[in-house]
């Protein structure tokens, strides 16, 4: 059986998928051994149906565009093979540990996620397929192993939206729903979302083996990550120190991109940090609407630890946790016989690497903000100009996405064209004062207004996944109308295009959107 076979014989081939996705098709991670995962079948999801499907991700995986319409598709990605899983093809849940809200939480793991296979991508990479909501695992703790329709749709939509914003992320192939009830803050229905990524290894995987005093397994994991994803680190003087630096730099770049589009992750625990620098684990995330630097998207985050302005600091802190976990490996190649001396040097080397985080993050964010302001030339006070705009937006609660999008309409010479963006500010005088500074800075640029506007519209999205847009799609999906999930997904594929036929998706949020809350209860 092969995914590439025609739809005509799909009824015969899809039930056999479980028999073909065994080792080595489950991927390299499963070969690390039983200490890294537990093999088990998914719990059947009754009467599954397709809620959403990304033909782009299917194409990436070499699957036909008609794949979702083939018989057995919903059963397959609900984790319900029509035949028993053969032993060699059993999915797996991986074990990891981590810090949650800054506190050591001990062993965690894939409590409701199962990796069901790995496929070669059309881009030459290999991608793991992981179903979230596949039932209880040994790492479920008090959970039921299920995901709900609400959170599954949000993850599906945002994974693809972030990709089209150019932000590193896991992808999402499909959402499968079911009428099976589950209890959260209220009674909801079950769903399964299929995530796609080169790897789902997290900072917490390294923390797990460090905390359990297993340097042998820690090294095995690090070697796996280096050999498969960071091969250049193998040639470094210290491969494990190089791994720390490479992962840290990707993390700094990622969070700079988050800040530039007003994205809040919501739960930046170390077990939710990808070793590849990807946005992973979409839970109580949100894009900032009315700008507030202290915006908290997760109503479970009562202390504001993961507020918008805190994300860079938390990312840096999480890198310290990764560094601590890698300390037993750093400096091994130096041949220092004295363990205390080697450990002391490892700490010094790790701290030197960690000191580079702000050196990477700051310039990355400055470049992003310069582009958002349409500034082609680099000037010393550009960061100050950008920060002053954010302060003015904060004071007026101006809409984040629309402010930057409408700035493209501002003229270098004609203040009468300021109205579209100016009207977003309560304090118009404060905006006018900033706009005068901005115009003075634009006078140093060589591009005309049209060229600058075109450049700004390529980096300032018109469309992002605002909470109220997702909520409308979710409410309709609960009534078995999935057209809004599809429509919204299509709009978010082209976030920088005008799409005049979809203007309503770029409007300010309605008043009722202010009462929406998202939390970890998914």
UniProtKB/Swiss-Prot annotation:
Reactions catalysed, as given in the entry: L-seryl-[protein] + ATP = 3-O-(5'-adenylyl)-L-seryl-[protein] + diphosphate; L-threonyl-[protein] + ATP = 3-O-(5'-adenylyl)-L-threonyl-[protein] + diphosphate; L-tyrosyl-[protein] + ATP = O-(5'-adenylyl)-L-tyrosyl-[protein] + diphosphate; L-histidyl-[protein] + UTP = N(tele)-(5'-uridylyl)-L-histidyl-[protein] + diphosphate
Binding site for Mg(2+): 272, 281
Catalytic center residues: 271 (proton acceptor)
EC number(s) on file: 2.7.7.-, 2.7.7.108
Molecular function via GO: AMPylase activity; ATP binding; magnesium ion binding
Cofactor: Mg(2+); Mn(2+)
Domain of life: Bacteria
Residues given in the record as ATP binding sites: 109, 111-112, 132, 144-145, 195, 202, 281
Keywords noted in UniProt: ATP-binding, Magnesium, Manganese, Metal-binding, Nucleotide-binding, Nucleotidyltransferase, Transferase
Recorded family membership: Belongs to the SELO family.
Function statement: Nucleotidyltransferase involved in the post-translational modification of proteins. It can catalyze the addition of adenosine monophosphate (AMP) or uridine monophosphate (UMP) to a protein, resulting in modifications known as AMPylation and UMPylation.
UniProt name for this protein: Protein nucleotidyltransferase YdiU
């Amino acid at each position: 059986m092969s995914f590439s076979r025609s739809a005509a014989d799909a009824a015969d081939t899809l039930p056999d998928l479980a028999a073909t996705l065994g080792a080595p098709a489950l991927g390299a991670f499963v070969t690390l051994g039983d200490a890294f995962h537990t093999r088990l079948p998914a719990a059947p999801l009754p009467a599954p149906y397709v809620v959403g499907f990304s033909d782009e991700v299917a194409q990436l995986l070499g699957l036909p565009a008609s794949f979702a319409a083939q018989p057995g598709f919903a059963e397959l990605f609900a984790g319900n093979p029509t035949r028993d899983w053969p032993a060699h093809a059993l999915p797996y849940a991986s074990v990891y540990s981590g810090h949650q809200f800054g506190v050591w939480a001990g062993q965690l793991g894939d409590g409701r996620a199962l990796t069901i296979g790995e496929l070669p991508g059309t881009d030459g990479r290999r991608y793991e397929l992981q179903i979230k909501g596949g039932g209880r695992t040994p790492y479920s703790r008090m959970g039921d192993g299920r995901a709900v329709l609400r959170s599954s749709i949000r993850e599906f939509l945002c994974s693809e939206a972030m990709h089209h914003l150019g932000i590193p992320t896991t992808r999402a192939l499909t959402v499968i729903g079911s009428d099976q009830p589950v209890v959260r803050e209220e009674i909801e229905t079950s769903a399964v979302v299929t995530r796609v990524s080169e790897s789902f290894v997290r900072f917490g995987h390294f923390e797990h083996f460090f905390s359990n005093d297993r340097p042998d397994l820690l090294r095995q994991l690090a070697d796996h990550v280096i050999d498969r994803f960071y091969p250049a680190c193998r040639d470094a003087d210290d491969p494990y120190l190089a791994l720390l630096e490479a992962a840290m730099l990707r993390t700094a770049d990622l969070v700079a991109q988050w800040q530039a589009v007003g994205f809040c992750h919501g739960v930046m625990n170390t077990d939710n940090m990808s070793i590849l620098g990807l946005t992973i684990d979409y839970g109580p995330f949100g894009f900032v609407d009315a700008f507030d630097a202290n915006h908290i998207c997760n109503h479970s985050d009562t202390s504001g630890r993961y507020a918008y302005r805190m994300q860079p600091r938390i990312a840096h802190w999480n890198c310290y946790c990764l560094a601590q976990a890698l300390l037993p490996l750093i400096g091994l190649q130096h041949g220092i016989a004295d363990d205390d001396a080697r450990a002391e040097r490892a700490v010094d080397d790790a701290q030197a690497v960690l000191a580079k985080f702000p050196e990477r993050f700051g310039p990355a964010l400055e470049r992003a903000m310069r582009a958002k302001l349409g500034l082609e030339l680099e000037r010393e006070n550009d960061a100050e100009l950008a920060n002053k705009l954010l302060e003015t937006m904060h004071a007026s609660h101006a809409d984040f996405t629309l402010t930057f999008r409408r700035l493209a309409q501002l003229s270098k010479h004609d203040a009468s064209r300021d109205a579209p963006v100016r009207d977003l500010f309560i304090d118009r005088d404060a905006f006018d004062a900033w706009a005068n500074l901005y115009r003075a800075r634009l006078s140093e640029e060589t591009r005309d207004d049209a060229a600058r506007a075109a450049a700004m519209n390529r980096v300032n999205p018109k469309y992002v996944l605002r909470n109220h847009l997702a909520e409308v799609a979710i409410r309709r999906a609960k009534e078995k109308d999935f057209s809004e999930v599809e429509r919204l997904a299509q709009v978010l594929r082209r976030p920088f295009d005008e799409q005049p036929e979809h203007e309503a998706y770029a409007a300010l949020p309605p008043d009722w959107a202010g009462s929406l809350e998202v939390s970890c209860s998914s």
